[in-house]
């Protein structure tokens, strides 16, 4: 019989699973897994409105991206961070949000009620008796 028996297949599958678990335990114990946190000196400076956004080469190369980020997230990170006014902080998340957006604060536009009026303007309504 050329095919392995089902018990041999099950034993092989179990062995592979146990090896994978052991490898993950060693990585966690050794602190090798990157949590996606970067030191504050690697954070890009916030940009002002109207100025082109420049990306830190480490972030553009994917160094700041968490190692467990999917390839889709990595491919979305680079173009997005180079075309936005803000920047993104990579993080390790179990909920799928691998990047936190950081947007600049904008000054509020002046409201029409606070605009100065001319003193010689005619009154808009008159009172009649």
Curated annotation (Swiss-Prot):
Residues 105-129 are annotated as: Disordered. InterPro entries: SOSSC. GO terms for cellular component: nucleoplasm; SOSS complex. It holds the Pfam family SOSSC. GO terms for biological process: DNA repair. Belongs to the SOSS-C family. This is SOSS complex subunit C homolog. It comes from Drosophila simulans (Fruit fly).
């Amino acid at each position: 019989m050329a095919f392995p028996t089902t018990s041999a297949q099950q034993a092989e599958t179990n062995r592979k699973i146990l090896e994978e678990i052991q490898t993950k335990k060693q990585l966690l114990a050794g602190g090798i897994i990157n949590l996606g946190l970067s030191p504050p000196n690697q954070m890009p400076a916030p940009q002002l409105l109207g100025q082109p956004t420049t990306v830190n080469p480490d972030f553009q190369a994917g160094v700041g991206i968490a190692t467990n980020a999917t390839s889709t997230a990595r491919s979305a990170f680079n173009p997005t961070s180079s075309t936005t006014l803000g920047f993104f902080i990579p993080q390790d998340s179990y909920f799928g949000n691998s990047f936190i957006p950081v947007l600049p604060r904008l000054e509020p536009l002046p409201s029409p009620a606070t605009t100065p009026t001319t003193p010689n303007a005619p009154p808009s309504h008159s009172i009649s008796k």
